[in-house]
Protein backbone atom coordinates (compact mmCIF):
# COMPACT_ATOMS: atom_id res chain seq x y z
CA UNK A 1 0.00 0.00 0.00
CA UNK A 2 1.11 3.58 -0.59
CA UNK A 3 0.57 6.95 0.98
CA UNK A 4 1.26 10.22 -0.83
CA UNK A 5 1.70 13.85 0.04
CA UNK A 6 -0.82 15.91 -1.95
CA UNK A 7 0.42 19.36 -0.97
CA UNK A 8 1.59 20.06 -4.54
CA UNK A 9 -0.96 21.33 -7.07
CA UNK A 10 -2.24 18.48 -9.30
CA UNK A 11 -2.09 18.53 -13.08
CA UNK A 12 -5.27 17.27 -14.78
CA UNK A 13 -4.30 14.71 -17.44
CA UNK A 14 -7.76 13.60 -18.58
CA UNK A 15 -11.36 14.13 -17.41
CA UNK A 16 -14.23 11.65 -17.62
CA UNK A 17 -17.82 12.03 -16.51
CA UNK A 18 -17.33 9.94 -13.38
CA UNK A 19 -13.70 10.69 -12.53
CA UNK A 20 -10.58 12.45 -13.72
CA UNK A 21 -6.90 11.52 -14.04
CA UNK A 22 -4.44 13.82 -12.29
CA UNK A 23 -0.68 13.85 -11.91
CA UNK A 24 1.24 14.81 -8.75
CA UNK A 25 5.04 14.75 -8.79
CA UNK A 26 5.04 12.55 -11.87
CA UNK A 27 2.54 10.01 -10.49
CA UNK A 28 -0.98 9.44 -11.77
CA UNK A 29 -4.09 9.22 -9.59
CA UNK A 30 -7.80 8.76 -10.13
CA UNK A 31 -9.35 11.74 -8.38
CA UNK A 32 -12.88 11.56 -6.95
CA UNK A 33 -12.89 14.79 -4.96
CA UNK A 34 -15.51 16.55 -7.11
CA UNK A 35 -19.06 15.94 -5.77
CA UNK A 36 -20.14 14.54 -9.13
CA UNK A 37 -17.43 11.88 -8.77
CA UNK A 38 -18.49 10.75 -5.29
CA UNK A 39 -20.43 7.76 -6.62
CA UNK A 40 -17.26 6.20 -7.97
CA UNK A 41 -15.48 6.91 -4.71
CA UNK A 42 -18.23 5.05 -2.85
CA UNK A 43 -17.71 2.09 -5.17
CA UNK A 44 -13.97 2.14 -4.51
CA UNK A 45 -14.47 2.18 -0.76
CA UNK A 46 -17.08 -0.58 -0.83
CA UNK A 47 -15.18 -2.98 -3.09
CA UNK A 48 -11.68 -2.33 -1.76
CA UNK A 49 -12.83 -2.74 1.84
CA UNK A 50 -13.83 -6.30 1.00
CA UNK A 51 -10.25 -7.08 -0.01
CA UNK A 52 -8.12 -4.77 2.13
CA UNK A 53 -7.78 -3.33 5.60
CA UNK A 54 -10.28 -0.44 5.81
CA UNK A 55 -7.59 1.72 7.41
CA UNK A 56 -5.46 1.28 4.29
CA UNK A 57 -8.35 2.33 2.07
CA UNK A 58 -8.98 5.46 4.15
CA UNK A 59 -5.33 6.45 3.65
CA UNK A 60 -6.13 7.26 0.02
CA UNK A 61 -8.77 9.85 0.93
CA UNK A 62 -10.27 10.93 -2.46
CA UNK A 63 -7.29 10.05 -4.65
CA UNK A 64 -6.35 6.51 -5.64
CA UNK A 65 -2.96 5.76 -7.24
CA UNK A 66 -3.34 4.25 -10.69
CA UNK A 67 -0.37 1.96 -10.01
CA UNK A 68 -2.39 0.46 -7.17
CA UNK A 69 -5.79 0.21 -8.88
CA UNK A 70 -4.50 -1.67 -11.94
CA UNK A 71 -4.05 -4.74 -9.71
CA UNK A 72 -7.72 -4.69 -8.67
CA UNK A 73 -9.50 -4.41 -12.03
CA UNK A 74 -11.49 -7.55 -11.22
CA UNK A 75 -13.19 -5.77 -8.32
CA UNK A 76 -14.64 -3.06 -10.54
CA UNK A 77 -16.45 -5.37 -12.98
CA UNK A 78 -19.54 -4.92 -10.79
CA UNK A 79 -19.68 -1.13 -11.11
CA UNK A 80 -22.74 -0.04 -13.09
CA UNK A 81 -23.01 1.89 -16.32
CA UNK A 82 -20.65 4.07 -18.26
CA UNK A 83 -18.39 4.75 -15.27
CA UNK A 84 -17.42 1.10 -15.20
CA UNK A 85 -16.60 0.90 -18.91
CA UNK A 86 -14.48 4.06 -18.88
CA UNK A 87 -12.68 3.07 -15.68
CA UNK A 88 -11.90 -0.51 -16.74
CA UNK A 89 -10.82 0.55 -20.22
CA UNK A 90 -8.46 3.13 -18.77
CA UNK A 91 -7.03 0.75 -16.15
CA UNK A 92 -6.50 -2.06 -18.65
CA UNK A 93 -4.64 0.24 -21.00
CA UNK A 94 -2.52 1.53 -18.12
CA UNK A 95 -1.78 -1.97 -16.95
CA UNK A 96 -0.64 -2.97 -20.42
CA UNK A 97 1.74 0.00 -20.53
CA UNK A 98 3.03 -0.64 -17.06
CA UNK A 99 3.59 -4.36 -17.65
CA UNK A 100 5.59 -3.60 -20.79
CA UNK A 101 7.62 -0.92 -19.03
CA UNK A 102 8.16 -3.08 -15.96
CA UNK A 103 9.24 -6.07 -18.08
CA UNK A 104 11.84 -3.92 -19.83
CA UNK A 105 13.23 -2.74 -16.48
CA UNK A 106 13.15 -6.23 -15.05
CA UNK A 107 15.32 -7.56 -17.87
CA UNK A 108 17.91 -4.95 -16.99
CA UNK A 109 17.63 -5.68 -13.26
CA UNK A 110 16.35 -2.17 -12.62
CA UNK A 111 13.39 -0.89 -10.58
CA UNK A 112 11.49 2.35 -10.13
CA UNK A 113 9.96 3.47 -6.86
CA UNK A 114 6.51 2.38 -8.07
CA UNK A 115 7.77 -1.16 -8.78
CA UNK A 116 8.56 -2.04 -5.17
CA UNK A 117 5.13 -3.46 -4.33
CA UNK A 118 5.06 -5.37 -7.63
CA UNK A 119 8.45 -6.95 -6.98
CA UNK A 120 7.60 -7.67 -3.33
CA UNK A 121 3.83 -8.30 -3.11
CA UNK A 122 2.16 -9.30 0.15
CA UNK A 123 3.07 -12.86 1.12
CA UNK A 124 6.61 -12.71 -0.32
CA UNK A 125 9.44 -14.13 1.79
CA UNK A 126 12.13 -11.46 2.15
CA UNK A 127 15.17 -10.44 4.13
CA UNK A 128 15.95 -6.85 5.04
CA UNK A 129 19.49 -5.60 5.64
CA UNK A 130 19.43 -2.99 8.41
CA UNK A 131 21.80 -0.04 8.50
CA UNK A 132 24.13 -1.85 10.93
CA UNK A 133 24.40 -4.83 8.60
CA UNK A 134 22.06 -7.11 10.53
CA UNK A 135 19.48 -9.19 8.67
CA UNK A 136 15.78 -9.48 9.45
CA UNK A 137 13.77 -12.30 7.90
CA UNK A 138 10.01 -12.18 7.41
CA UNK A 139 7.00 -12.33 5.11
CA UNK A 140 5.69 -9.13 3.52
CA UNK A 141 2.42 -8.06 5.14
CA UNK A 142 2.18 -4.54 3.67
CA UNK A 143 4.28 -1.78 2.12
CA UNK A 144 3.47 1.93 2.40
CA UNK A 145 5.24 4.77 0.66
CA UNK A 146 5.42 7.51 3.29
CA UNK A 147 6.60 11.09 3.13
CA UNK A 148 8.88 12.67 5.73
CA UNK A 149 9.44 16.40 6.01
CA UNK A 150 13.07 15.75 6.99
CA UNK A 151 14.12 12.85 4.78
CA UNK A 152 11.63 12.80 1.92
CA UNK A 153 9.88 9.65 0.71
CA UNK A 154 10.52 6.31 2.38
CA UNK A 155 8.94 2.86 2.40
CA UNK A 156 7.40 1.54 5.60
CA UNK A 157 7.61 -2.24 5.29
CA UNK A 158 5.67 -4.46 7.67
CA UNK A 159 7.05 -7.99 7.98
CA UNK A 160 5.31 -10.96 9.56
CA UNK A 161 7.76 -12.42 12.12
CA UNK A 162 7.99 -14.55 15.26
CA UNK A 163 8.64 -12.72 18.53
CA UNK A 164 8.21 -13.12 22.30
CA UNK A 165 7.82 -9.55 23.55
CA UNK A 166 4.95 -10.53 25.85
CA UNK A 167 6.72 -13.53 27.32
CA UNK A 168 5.20 -16.06 24.94
CA UNK A 169 5.94 -16.99 21.35
CA UNK A 170 3.63 -15.09 19.00
CA UNK A 171 3.09 -14.14 15.41
CA UNK A 172 3.75 -10.45 15.08
CA UNK A 173 4.98 -7.64 12.87
CA UNK A 174 8.40 -6.07 12.55
CA UNK A 175 8.37 -2.68 10.82
CA UNK A 176 11.42 -1.53 8.88
CA UNK A 177 12.05 1.61 6.81
CA UNK A 178 13.66 1.74 3.39
CA UNK A 179 14.61 5.09 1.80
CA UNK A 180 12.68 6.10 -1.29
CA UNK A 181 14.47 6.86 -4.55
CA UNK A 182 13.96 8.63 -7.87
CA UNK A 183 14.43 7.26 -11.34
CA UNK A 184 15.69 3.73 -11.88
CA UNK A 185 18.11 1.89 -9.56
CA UNK A 186 19.50 -1.67 -9.59
CA UNK A 187 17.24 -4.08 -7.73
CA UNK A 188 20.31 -5.46 -5.97
CA UNK A 189 21.02 -2.04 -4.45
CA UNK A 190 17.89 -2.20 -2.28
CA UNK A 191 18.23 -3.41 1.33
CA UNK A 192 15.12 -5.52 0.69
CA UNK A 193 15.59 -8.77 -1.22
CA UNK A 194 14.35 -12.32 -1.55
CA UNK A 195 16.37 -14.68 0.68
CA UNK A 196 19.11 -16.91 -0.68
CA UNK A 197 19.82 -20.35 0.77
CA UNK A 198 22.73 -18.82 2.68
CA UNK A 199 20.42 -16.13 4.10
CA UNK A 200 17.90 -18.74 5.22
CA UNK A 201 20.60 -20.85 6.90
CA UNK A 202 22.09 -17.86 8.73
CA UNK A 203 18.68 -16.70 9.94
CA UNK A 204 17.60 -20.23 10.90
CA UNK A 205 20.74 -20.70 13.00
CA UNK A 206 19.95 -17.48 14.84
CA UNK A 207 16.34 -18.59 15.19
CA UNK A 208 17.49 -21.74 16.98
CA UNK A 209 19.13 -19.51 19.59
CA UNK A 210 15.90 -17.53 19.86
CA UNK A 211 14.02 -20.78 20.49
CA UNK A 212 16.53 -21.73 23.19
CA UNK A 213 16.61 -18.43 25.09
CA UNK A 214 13.22 -16.71 24.63
CA UNK A 215 11.45 -18.10 27.71
CA UNK A 216 11.11 -15.65 30.66
CA UNK A 217 13.58 -16.47 33.43
CA UNK A 218 16.19 -17.90 31.06
CA UNK A 219 19.69 -17.34 32.45
CA UNK A 220 22.45 -17.10 29.86
CA UNK A 221 25.83 -15.60 29.03
CA UNK A 222 26.04 -12.49 26.87
CA UNK A 223 28.76 -10.69 24.98
CA UNK A 224 27.76 -7.37 23.49
CA UNK A 225 25.79 -4.21 24.11
CA UNK A 226 22.62 -3.59 26.09
CA UNK A 227 20.46 -0.96 24.39
CA UNK A 228 17.93 1.42 25.97
CA UNK A 229 16.39 3.44 23.12
CA UNK A 230 14.73 6.79 23.70
CA UNK A 231 12.84 9.20 21.46
CA UNK A 232 15.96 10.95 20.15
CA UNK A 233 18.82 8.54 20.74
CA UNK A 234 19.78 5.41 22.66
CA UNK A 235 21.76 4.66 25.79
CA UNK A 236 24.15 1.77 25.35
CA UNK A 237 26.01 -0.25 27.95
CA UNK A 238 28.79 -2.76 27.44
CA UNK A 239 27.06 -5.71 29.09
CA UNK A 240 29.49 -8.62 28.86
CA UNK A 241 28.48 -11.10 31.54
CA UNK A 242 25.31 -12.90 32.48
CA UNK A 243 21.75 -11.81 31.73
CA UNK A 244 18.22 -12.92 32.58
CA UNK A 245 15.61 -12.84 29.81
CA UNK A 246 12.38 -11.50 31.31
CA UNK A 247 10.25 -9.12 29.21
CA UNK A 248 7.33 -9.41 31.65
CA UNK A 249 9.25 -8.06 34.66
CA UNK A 250 10.93 -5.52 32.37
CA UNK A 251 7.57 -4.07 31.31
CA UNK A 252 6.31 -4.01 34.89
CA UNK A 253 9.37 -2.39 36.49
CA UNK A 254 10.52 -0.02 33.74
CA UNK A 255 7.46 0.66 31.53
CA UNK A 256 8.90 3.73 29.79
CA UNK A 257 12.18 2.06 28.81
CA UNK A 258 10.22 -1.02 27.77
CA UNK A 259 7.89 1.00 25.55
CA UNK A 260 10.84 2.75 23.88
CA UNK A 261 12.55 -0.60 23.26
CA UNK A 262 9.51 -2.09 21.54
CA UNK A 263 8.68 1.01 19.51
CA UNK A 264 12.25 1.51 18.31
CA UNK A 265 12.51 -2.12 17.27
CA UNK A 266 9.28 -1.79 15.28
CA UNK A 267 7.72 -4.84 16.95
CA UNK A 268 3.94 -5.17 17.24
CA UNK A 269 1.52 -7.99 17.96
CA UNK A 270 -0.57 -9.64 15.27
CA UNK A 271 -3.81 -9.83 17.22
CA UNK A 272 -5.59 -11.89 14.58
CA UNK A 273 -2.95 -14.60 14.50
CA UNK A 274 -1.93 -14.37 18.16
CA UNK A 275 -0.84 -17.64 19.75
CA UNK A 276 -1.28 -19.69 16.58
CA UNK A 277 1.97 -21.42 17.41
CA UNK A 278 1.28 -23.99 20.10
CA UNK A 279 3.30 -23.44 23.23
CA UNK A 280 4.15 -27.11 23.65
CA UNK A 281 5.63 -27.16 20.14
CA UNK A 282 7.38 -23.84 20.78
CA UNK A 283 8.56 -22.77 17.32
CA UNK A 284 8.39 -24.81 14.13
CA UNK A 285 11.78 -25.30 12.51
CA UNK A 286 10.37 -23.88 9.30
CA UNK A 287 9.79 -20.60 11.16
CA UNK A 288 13.28 -20.27 12.67
CA UNK A 289 14.43 -18.00 9.84
CA UNK A 290 11.86 -15.31 10.67
CA UNK A 291 12.45 -15.06 14.43
CA UNK A 292 13.32 -11.52 15.52
CA UNK A 293 16.99 -10.84 16.37
CA UNK A 294 16.45 -9.36 19.86
CA UNK A 295 15.29 -10.42 23.30
CA UNK A 296 14.58 -8.31 26.38
CA UNK A 297 15.73 -8.63 29.97
CA UNK A 298 18.17 -7.64 32.70
CA UNK A 299 21.97 -7.49 32.73
CA UNK A 300 23.40 -8.66 36.05
CA UNK A 301 26.70 -7.06 35.06
CA UNK A 302 25.50 -3.46 34.57
CA UNK A 303 22.23 -3.77 36.57
CA UNK A 304 20.09 -2.38 33.74
CA UNK A 305 17.01 -3.49 31.80
CA UNK A 306 17.19 -3.34 28.02
CA UNK A 307 17.40 -5.05 24.66
CA UNK A 308 19.93 -7.76 23.82
CA UNK A 309 21.05 -9.04 20.43
CA UNK A 310 20.53 -12.79 20.13
CA UNK A 311 23.84 -13.16 18.26
CA UNK A 312 25.64 -12.32 21.53
CA UNK A 313 23.90 -14.97 23.64
CA UNK A 314 25.34 -18.33 24.63
CA UNK A 315 24.96 -21.00 27.28
CA UNK A 316 26.75 -20.41 30.57
CA UNK A 317 29.98 -22.27 31.22
CA UNK A 318 29.46 -23.08 34.87
CA UNK A 319 32.43 -23.17 37.25
CA UNK A 320 31.26 -26.13 39.30
CA UNK A 321 34.64 -26.40 41.04
CA UNK A 322 34.19 -22.96 42.65
CA UNK A 323 32.36 -24.54 45.59
CA UNK A 324 35.08 -27.11 46.21
CA UNK A 325 37.73 -24.38 46.20
CA UNK A 326 35.83 -22.19 48.63
CA UNK A 327 37.88 -22.03 51.84
CA UNK A 328 35.11 -22.26 54.43
CA UNK A 329 34.69 -24.86 57.17
CA UNK A 330 32.84 -28.00 56.09
CA UNK A 331 29.92 -27.55 58.48
CA UNK A 332 29.14 -24.04 57.20
CA UNK A 333 29.42 -25.16 53.58
CA UNK A 334 27.04 -28.06 54.15
CA UNK A 335 24.54 -25.77 55.88
CA UNK A 336 24.62 -23.18 53.08
CA UNK A 337 24.34 -25.79 50.33
CA UNK A 338 21.41 -27.63 51.92
CA UNK A 339 19.36 -24.55 52.76
CA UNK A 340 19.80 -23.00 49.31
CA UNK A 341 19.22 -26.19 47.34
CA UNK A 342 16.07 -27.23 49.19
CA UNK A 343 14.78 -23.73 49.93
CA UNK A 344 11.01 -23.38 49.98
CA UNK A 345 10.21 -27.06 50.54
CA UNK A 346 9.36 -26.85 54.23
CA UNK A 347 7.12 -24.97 56.67
CA UNK A 348 6.59 -21.28 55.93
CA UNK A 349 4.17 -19.52 58.29
CA UNK A 350 0.74 -19.90 59.87
CA UNK A 351 -0.25 -16.55 58.35
CA UNK A 352 -0.70 -16.88 54.60
CA UNK A 353 1.47 -14.52 52.57
CA UNK A 354 4.21 -14.05 55.13
CA UNK A 355 7.67 -14.80 53.90
CA UNK A 356 9.17 -18.27 53.83
CA UNK A 357 12.54 -17.00 52.72
CA UNK A 358 15.98 -18.15 53.80
CA UNK A 359 18.15 -15.28 55.01
CA UNK A 360 21.85 -15.78 55.73
CA UNK A 361 23.92 -13.32 57.72
CA UNK A 362 27.61 -13.76 56.96
CA UNK A 363 29.88 -11.75 59.23
CA UNK A 364 33.60 -11.48 59.85
CA UNK A 365 36.71 -9.68 58.69
CA UNK A 366 36.85 -8.50 55.07
CA UNK A 367 38.20 -10.79 52.38
CA UNK A 368 37.65 -14.23 53.94
CA UNK A 369 34.86 -15.74 51.87
CA UNK A 370 31.56 -14.07 52.76
CA UNK A 371 30.82 -12.80 49.25
CA UNK A 372 32.51 -15.82 47.68
CA UNK A 373 30.15 -18.18 49.55
CA UNK A 374 27.08 -16.68 47.85
CA UNK A 375 28.84 -16.65 44.49
CA UNK A 376 30.02 -20.26 44.78
CA UNK A 377 26.71 -21.77 45.91
CA UNK A 378 24.86 -19.99 43.06
CA UNK A 379 27.43 -21.36 40.63
CA UNK A 380 27.15 -24.89 42.03
CA UNK A 381 23.34 -24.92 41.86
CA UNK A 382 23.23 -23.12 38.46
CA UNK A 383 21.15 -20.25 39.79
CA UNK A 384 21.44 -16.55 38.90
CA UNK A 385 23.45 -14.50 41.39
CA UNK A 386 21.97 -11.03 41.84
CA UNK A 387 24.55 -8.99 43.73
CA UNK A 388 23.39 -5.63 45.09
CA UNK A 389 25.41 -2.93 46.78
CA UNK A 390 23.91 -0.55 49.33
CA UNK A 391 24.48 2.39 46.98
CA UNK A 392 22.05 0.93 44.43
CA UNK A 393 19.14 1.07 46.88
CA UNK A 394 18.94 4.85 47.21
CA UNK A 395 19.23 7.19 50.16
CA UNK A 396 15.56 7.94 50.84
CA UNK A 397 12.85 5.76 52.35
CA UNK A 398 10.68 5.89 49.21
CA UNK A 399 13.57 5.06 46.88
CA UNK A 400 14.69 2.21 49.13
CA UNK A 401 11.24 0.65 49.31
CA UNK A 402 10.60 0.81 45.57
CA UNK A 403 14.05 -0.38 44.56
CA UNK A 404 14.35 -3.14 47.15
CA UNK A 405 10.83 -4.41 46.50
CA UNK A 406 11.60 -4.68 42.78
CA UNK A 407 14.85 -6.51 43.49
CA UNK A 408 13.24 -8.97 45.91
CA UNK A 409 10.39 -9.62 43.46
CA UNK A 410 12.58 -10.54 40.50
CA UNK A 411 14.94 -12.55 42.70
CA UNK A 412 12.01 -14.81 43.60
CA UNK A 413 10.75 -14.98 39.99
CA UNK A 414 14.21 -15.96 38.71
CA UNK A 415 14.89 -18.32 41.65
CA UNK A 416 18.06 -16.31 42.13
CA UNK A 417 20.53 -16.14 44.98
CA UNK A 418 20.37 -12.53 46.16
CA UNK A 419 23.46 -10.99 47.74
CA UNK A 420 23.29 -7.67 49.59
CA UNK A 421 26.93 -6.88 50.27
CA UNK A 422 28.12 -4.63 53.10
CA UNK A 423 24.59 -4.18 54.42
CA UNK A 424 25.74 -2.44 57.63
CA UNK A 425 23.71 0.74 57.12
CA UNK A 426 20.43 -1.21 57.14
CA UNK A 427 21.43 -3.65 59.88
CA UNK A 428 22.80 -1.26 62.48
CA UNK A 429 20.84 -0.62 65.65
CA UNK A 430 18.37 2.22 65.37
CA UNK A 431 19.14 5.56 66.98
CA UNK A 432 16.37 7.77 68.35
CA UNK A 433 18.18 10.85 67.01
CA UNK A 434 18.35 9.63 63.38
CA UNK A 435 14.75 9.43 62.24
CA UNK A 436 15.55 9.09 58.51
CA UNK A 437 17.80 6.07 58.98
CA UNK A 438 15.35 4.53 61.44
CA UNK A 439 12.66 4.72 58.75
CA UNK A 440 14.95 3.01 56.24
CA UNK A 441 15.74 0.23 58.72
CA UNK A 442 12.01 -0.19 59.33
CA UNK A 443 11.33 -0.55 55.59
CA UNK A 444 14.16 -3.05 55.29
CA UNK A 445 12.80 -5.13 58.19
CA UNK A 446 9.28 -5.18 56.77
CA UNK A 447 10.35 -6.27 53.29
CA UNK A 448 12.56 -9.03 54.71
CA UNK A 449 9.57 -10.28 56.72
CA UNK A 450 7.69 -11.07 53.49
CA UNK A 451 10.57 -12.18 51.29
CA UNK A 452 10.25 -15.71 49.89
CA UNK A 453 13.65 -16.15 48.30
CA UNK A 454 17.27 -16.78 49.28
CA UNK A 455 19.11 -13.72 50.57
CA UNK A 456 22.70 -13.36 51.75
CA UNK A 457 23.57 -10.34 53.90
CA UNK A 458 27.22 -9.60 54.65
CA UNK A 459 28.59 -7.32 57.34
CA UNK A 460 31.79 -6.55 59.24
CA UNK A 461 29.92 -5.08 62.22
CA UNK A 462 27.80 -7.87 63.64
CA UNK A 463 27.92 -6.45 67.19
CA UNK A 464 26.00 -3.35 66.10
CA UNK A 465 23.05 -5.14 64.46
CA UNK A 466 19.57 -4.06 65.50
CA UNK A 467 17.94 -6.72 67.68
CA UNK A 468 14.85 -6.80 65.43
CA UNK A 469 16.92 -8.61 62.81
CA UNK A 470 17.69 -11.57 65.08
CA UNK A 471 14.38 -13.30 64.39
CA UNK A 472 14.44 -12.46 60.67
CA UNK A 473 17.79 -14.13 60.04
CA UNK A 474 17.65 -17.87 59.32
CA UNK A 475 21.36 -18.59 59.78
CA UNK A 476 24.27 -16.45 60.97
CA UNK A 477 27.78 -17.64 60.12
CA UNK A 478 31.02 -16.19 61.41
CA UNK A 479 33.91 -16.15 58.91
CA UNK A 480 37.27 -16.36 60.63
CA UNK A 481 40.67 -15.80 59.06
CA UNK A 482 42.72 -18.15 61.23
CA UNK A 483 44.32 -21.04 59.35
CA UNK A 484 42.82 -20.17 55.95
CA UNK A 485 45.60 -18.25 54.26
CA UNK A 486 47.56 -21.24 52.98
CA UNK A 487 44.47 -22.90 51.46
CA UNK A 488 43.41 -19.63 49.81
CA UNK A 489 46.89 -19.09 48.37
CA UNK A 490 46.98 -22.68 47.08
CA UNK A 491 43.56 -22.49 45.41
CA UNK A 492 44.10 -19.10 43.81
CA UNK A 493 47.60 -19.94 42.59
CA UNK A 494 46.24 -23.11 40.97
CA UNK A 495 43.33 -21.21 39.40
CA UNK A 496 45.82 -18.72 37.92
CA UNK A 497 47.96 -21.51 36.46
CA UNK A 498 50.84 -20.83 38.87
CA UNK A 499 52.85 -23.12 41.14
CA UNK A 500 50.67 -23.94 44.19
CA UNK A 501 53.76 -24.81 46.26
CA UNK A 502 54.53 -21.08 46.41
CA UNK A 503 51.76 -20.92 49.01
CA UNK A 504 54.18 -22.17 51.68
CA UNK A 505 56.42 -19.15 51.24
CA UNK A 506 53.59 -16.63 50.79
CA UNK A 507 51.34 -17.68 53.69
CA UNK A 508 53.26 -15.69 56.38
CA UNK A 509 52.15 -12.44 54.73
CA UNK A 510 49.07 -11.28 56.62
CA UNK A 511 46.65 -10.58 53.75
CA UNK A 512 43.06 -11.64 53.15
CA UNK A 513 41.56 -13.52 50.22
CA UNK A 514 40.61 -10.43 48.25
CA UNK A 515 44.11 -9.01 48.68
CA UNK A 516 45.60 -12.33 47.56
CA UNK A 517 43.61 -12.15 44.30
CA UNK A 518 44.74 -8.58 43.75
CA UNK A 519 48.36 -9.53 44.46
CA UNK A 520 48.28 -12.34 41.89
CA UNK A 521 46.85 -9.98 39.25
CA UNK A 522 49.45 -7.35 40.10
CA UNK A 523 52.26 -9.91 39.98
CA UNK A 524 51.15 -11.10 36.54
CA UNK A 525 51.14 -7.50 35.32
CA UNK A 526 54.65 -6.90 36.67
CA UNK A 527 55.91 -10.00 34.87
CA UNK A 528 54.26 -8.98 31.58
CA UNK A 529 55.86 -5.55 31.87
CA UNK A 530 59.27 -7.29 31.91
CA UNK A 531 58.24 -9.74 29.17
CA UNK A 532 58.93 -12.87 31.21
CA UNK A 533 57.12 -15.54 33.20
CA UNK A 534 55.83 -14.61 36.60
CA UNK A 535 58.09 -15.39 39.56
CA UNK A 536 57.37 -15.66 43.26
CA UNK A 537 59.34 -12.44 43.74
CA UNK A 538 56.65 -10.62 41.71
CA UNK A 539 53.99 -11.82 44.13
CA UNK A 540 56.07 -10.84 47.15
CA UNK A 541 56.55 -7.39 45.68
CA UNK A 542 52.81 -7.04 45.10
CA UNK A 543 51.93 -8.28 48.59
CA UNK A 544 54.48 -5.95 50.19
CA UNK A 545 52.92 -2.99 48.37
CA UNK A 546 49.49 -4.04 49.64
CA UNK A 547 50.68 -4.34 53.24
CA UNK A 548 52.53 -1.00 53.05
CA UNK A 549 49.33 0.73 51.96
CA UNK A 550 47.25 -0.91 54.69
CA UNK A 551 49.87 -0.12 57.34
CA UNK A 552 49.99 3.55 56.37
CA UNK A 553 46.20 3.78 56.41
CA UNK A 554 46.00 2.27 59.89
CA UNK A 555 48.65 4.61 61.26
CA UNK A 556 46.91 7.60 59.67
CA UNK A 557 43.42 6.54 60.84
CA UNK A 558 43.76 4.36 63.93
CA UNK A 559 40.04 4.53 64.74
CA UNK A 560 39.14 2.95 61.39
CA UNK A 561 41.54 0.08 61.91
CA UNK A 562 40.14 -1.37 65.14
CA UNK A 563 38.68 -4.50 63.51
CA UNK A 564 41.33 -4.98 60.83
CA UNK A 565 43.59 -7.33 62.83
CA UNK A 566 47.36 -7.40 63.28
CA UNK A 567 49.74 -6.58 60.45
CA UNK A 568 52.44 -9.02 59.39
CA UNK A 569 55.87 -7.58 60.11
CA UNK A 570 57.70 -6.96 56.85
CA UNK A 571 60.72 -4.93 55.85
CA UNK A 572 58.95 -1.74 54.85
CA UNK A 573 61.12 1.32 55.44
CA UNK A 574 58.53 4.09 55.44
CA UNK A 575 56.23 2.66 58.12
CA UNK A 576 59.21 1.90 60.43
CA UNK A 577 60.42 5.48 60.27
CA UNK A 578 56.94 6.66 61.08
CA UNK A 579 56.71 4.42 64.15
CA UNK A 580 60.14 5.63 65.35
CA UNK A 581 59.11 9.27 65.05
CA UNK A 582 55.91 8.62 66.97
CA UNK A 583 57.83 6.77 69.71
CA UNK A 584 60.27 9.70 70.16
CA UNK A 585 57.36 12.12 70.37
CA UNK A 586 55.67 10.01 73.01
CA UNK A 587 58.91 9.73 75.03
CA UNK A 588 59.46 13.50 74.88
CA UNK A 589 55.92 14.06 76.05
CA UNK A 590 56.43 11.76 79.05
CA UNK A 591 59.58 13.71 80.03
CA UNK A 592 57.64 16.94 79.96
CA UNK A 593 59.22 18.31 76.80
Where are the language model's segments positioned?
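C-terminal domain-closing interface element
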Residues: 428-431, 566-576
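Intrinsically disordered, polybasic Lys/Arg-rich low-complexity tracts
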Residues: 576-588
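AAA+ P-loop NTPase nucleotide-binding core of proteostasis motors
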Residues: 468, 477, 552, 556-561
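Walker A/P-loop NTP-binding motif of AAA+ ATPase domains
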Residues: 322, 326-507, 590-593
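Short, polar/charged, Gly/Pro-enriched helix-capping and turn/loop motifs at alpha-helix termini
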Residues: 418, 458, 499, 530-534, ...
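Conserved AAA+ ATPase small/helical "lid" subdomain
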Residues: 477, 496-547
Amino acid sequence: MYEYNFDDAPIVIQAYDGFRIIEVKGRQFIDCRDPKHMLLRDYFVAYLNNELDSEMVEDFSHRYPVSFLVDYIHLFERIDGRNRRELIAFLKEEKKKRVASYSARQKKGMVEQGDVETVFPAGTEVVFAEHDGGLIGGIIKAIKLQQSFWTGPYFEIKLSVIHAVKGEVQQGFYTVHMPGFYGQVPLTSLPLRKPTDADKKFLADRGKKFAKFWKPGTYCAYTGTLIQPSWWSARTFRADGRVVIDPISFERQEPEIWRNCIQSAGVSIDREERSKIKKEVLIRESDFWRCVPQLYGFSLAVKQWGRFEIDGMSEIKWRDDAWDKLVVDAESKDLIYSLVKFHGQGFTDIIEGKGGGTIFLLHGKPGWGKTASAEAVAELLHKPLYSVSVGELGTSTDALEKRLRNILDVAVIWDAVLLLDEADIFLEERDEHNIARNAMVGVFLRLLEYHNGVLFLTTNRVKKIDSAFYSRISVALHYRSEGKAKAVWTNLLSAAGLDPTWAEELTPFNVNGRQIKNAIRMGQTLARAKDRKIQISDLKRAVTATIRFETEMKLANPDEAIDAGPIQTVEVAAPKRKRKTETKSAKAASNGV
